[in-house]
Amino acid sequence: MQIILLEKVANLGNLGDIVKVKDGYARNFLIPNRKARRATKDAIAEFEVRRAELEKVAAEKLAAAQAVGEKLNGQTFEITQKSGVDGRLFGSVTNGDVAELLKKAGYEIEKAQVRMPEGPLKMIGEHGVQVALHTDVLVDVTVNVIGDHA
């Protein structure tokens, strides 16, 4: 299916690009989330009329994400979990736990925005975590897992 991207989509393209994607990806994700429209002649003409408005909105989103990123970059957050004597956690710290921790600190972060390269945290200590605020804004934060010996 041919679609017009209404915003930048990772691994796909930028605002205004006409790309071919699988039908299911377009119907189930891109179109319902208002990231794209079908590339019909009418839609292309309407997009060209609204292009400046959409670019302005995209620039505002990027600026807002960069402002939050400057505040968030390099910060350290602490979370307490039950652990054994050897430093291993009972359970783990997931991206949902980190997102909840950031929300309590006053940041609007969804769990899908938290990237944990090594998977869930299973040991006490400091761990690096990435937060994707925008497709162009990746921020590194440190999560210090404190063990609560049971």
UniProtKB/Swiss-Prot annotation:
SUPFAM superfamilies linked: L9 N-domain-like (SSF55658), Ribosomal protein L9 C-domain (SSF55653)
Stated name of the protein: Large ribosomal subunit protein bL9
Record has DNA damage as a keyword: no
GO CC annotation terms, alphabetical: ribonucleoprotein complex; ribosome
Pfam families, A to Z: Ribosomal_L9_C, Ribosomal_L9_N
GO terms of biological process kind: translation
Alphabetical UniProt keywords: Ribonucleoprotein, Ribosomal protein, RNA-binding, rRNA-binding
InterPro entries with a match to the protein in the record: Ribosomal_bL9 (IPR000244), Ribosomal_bL9/RNase_H1_N (IPR009027), Ribosomal_bL9_bac/chp (IPR020594), Ribosomal_bL9_C (IPR020069), Ribosomal_bL9_C_sf (IPR036791), Ribosomal_bL9_N (IPR020070), Ribosomal_bL9_N_sf (IPR036935)
Organism: Burkholderia pseudomallei (strain 668)
Family as reported in the entry's similarity comment: Belongs to the bacterial ribosomal protein bL9 family.
NCBIfam families membership: L9
GO MF term set: rRNA binding; structural constituent of ribosome
Its job: Binds to the 23S rRNA.
PANTHER family assigned: 50S RIBOSOMAL PROTEIN L9
